Amino acid sequence: KRGRLIAISTYVELLPVYVIFLFSSGSTLTFRERDWILITDFENLTGNPLFEKSLYTAFSLSISQSRYINVLPRSRMLENLDRMNSADRTTVDEPAGKEIAVREGIDLYIVPGISEAGSNFAITSKIVETASGNIVKSQVMYADTRDDILSTLDQLSRKIRRDLGESRYNIASQDKPLKKVTTSSLEALKLFSQGIDC
């Protein structure tokens, strides 16, 4: 009986800690719930054109599952490129992303990237402060094969949502694997992305 009472007492003591762990924001960034974020196109250092637009589409879709974060729509970014008289009106690289973020009054933007790391793929992200250009958070995760890239994007998306202050509880309840909410084919995602940019 004494052992059971100790166990119950320990559980009661730890419960508030667990609740704080589950629901706390855990962020020091200047981002509030329902603020806007801009995601640039992927910095593709692999030379594989398959990744040019497909990964942006998958990554933005993954983060857009969050009701905590507002992701600036692709259509709005392309409208800005038109107004900027950009030479390339379908590509949002880091400089273009920064200018669009300034125009839209967005405090932070995300620059994702992919490169080859031996036989693996390195998936990276930078959260950049628009006003200063400073990188305030950066992440790198690895996919063993091309087939693992979407699941790695899922992991990266969850980490970024956490970095922006979303609680673990909200992330767990608003997070479906990309392979369930869209196609698992990067080729199909690329074709879909090209249709959006036309």
Short names for language-model regions:
Residues 4-198:
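Acidic, proline/glycine-rich low-complexity intrinsically disordered segments
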